[in-house]
Amino acid sequence: MNFNKKTIEDVQVKGKKVLVRCDFNVPLKDGVITDENRLNGAMPTIKYLVDNGAQVILCSHMGKPKGEAKPEFSLAPVAKRLSEMLGKEVVFAADDNVVGENAKKAVAEMKDGDVVLLQNTRYRKEETKNGEELSKELASLAEMFVNDAFGTAHRAHCSTVGVTEYLKPAVCGYLIQKELKFLGDAVETPERPFVAILGGAKVSDKINVINNLLEKVDTLIIGGGMAYTFLKAQGYTVGSSLVEEDKVEYAKEMLAKAEEKGVKLLLPVDHRVAKEFKDVEAVVTEDQNIAEGFMGLDIGPKTEAIYAEAIKDAKTVIWNGPMGVFEFENFNKGTIAVAKAMAEADATTIIGGGDSAAAVNILGFGDKMSHISTGGGASLEFLEGKVLPGIAALNDK
């Protein structure tokens, strides 16, 4: 996949109507946005366009309204908050059919530097099916397209891919540019040693990632629930820990592949365990084995030290997925240890979105990382070596 895409700085935007696909898929509680990370992420692109005299038409999805106009998925609160953040009115076009009379009127009346936000694109069924009609309607509003929603770059939808058939030029905003730079460099030309850390519950979610990264990394660290499938493959006892029985053979293949490629594959050498899936006091095991009746819920202190050492020696580190049950205070230690080691490392440190990003932000290490990806699913597919349709659809430099 070509990562060298045209950006908003490569096109003339003054006086032009510019459709921008943002990622405003933010959590709401009682109509108030509870996490503004994605709004903050979109600001540099929106401000650049406003400051350079573009007429800015924003669009995004939120949640899964499944093709129906459900008020709880309305982008009205986003328009309100964006107005406050920009210090100027963001006109909200509240059309249930997204590109309706309100949108057309608002867009027709725009002056340079004005901003309009369209209603949730997933109010229309065809959005997720990449239907021609909505793609054409969105394209008809503007003279060029900017994609700045990395979080949906792995989806071929109307507002990410379909619209580019009818609207050129199609370029990326600052957010996607930054994602492509950090993730692209890490995967294509990393500074070595290159260490990848994978956690989370299931091996099945990360099969292609493990396979692809074993071709590229010097060290692969595995924690979280998926470690138990690997330990079982090595013949250790795992008690009542989460194991994907149908993936034990696959784990054996990956262990063999790591050896063949000369990749260090690090697995837990001790665990924090409990008798039930609850936030109870942790029992620390002596070694890799977990006794009958106990389940592994986090990596142990010896493992933390080994993982931290590997991170300390690295020049590029990429992390996706927690080391244990991060929501339980007794079992968040491994995740904290990895986050801390990355924060202190003299390396390019990349967090692959999702749970790891949330953990790093909660722990206050966010500003110590080189890059926190805004797309969990998209960054995983990127690490699998897949082409992301939303990126592929943009014009090359």
Curated annotation (Swiss-Prot):
The protein's annotated pathway: Carbohydrate degradation; glycolysis; pyruvate from D-glyceraldehyde 3-phosphate: step 2/5
Principal location class: cytoplasm
CDD domains the record matches: Phosphoglycerate_kinase
Gene Ontology biological process terms from the UniProt entry: gluconeogenesis; glycolytic process
Binding site for substrate: D23, F24, N25, R38, H61, M62, G63, K64, R122, R155
Reaction(s) catalysed by this chain's protein: (2R)-3-phosphoglycerate + ATP = (2R)-3-phospho-glyceroyl phosphate + ADP
Single GO molecular function: ADP binding
Xref: SUPFAM superfamilies: Phosphoglycerate kinase (SSF53748)
Ligand binding (ATP): K206, G296, E327, G353, G354, D355, S356
EC code: 2.7.2.3
Top EC group: transferase
Keywords associated with the record: ATP-binding, Cytoplasm, Glycolysis, Kinase, Nucleotide-binding, Transferase
Any Gene Ontology CC annotation: cytosol
Subcellular localization, as worded in the UniProt entry: Cytoplasm
Entry's family note: Belongs to the phosphoglycerate kinase family.
Subunit and interaction comment: Monomer.
Protein name as annotated: Phosphoglycerate kinase
Natural source organism: Clostridium perfringens (strain SM101 / Type A)
Gene this chain is encoded by: pgk
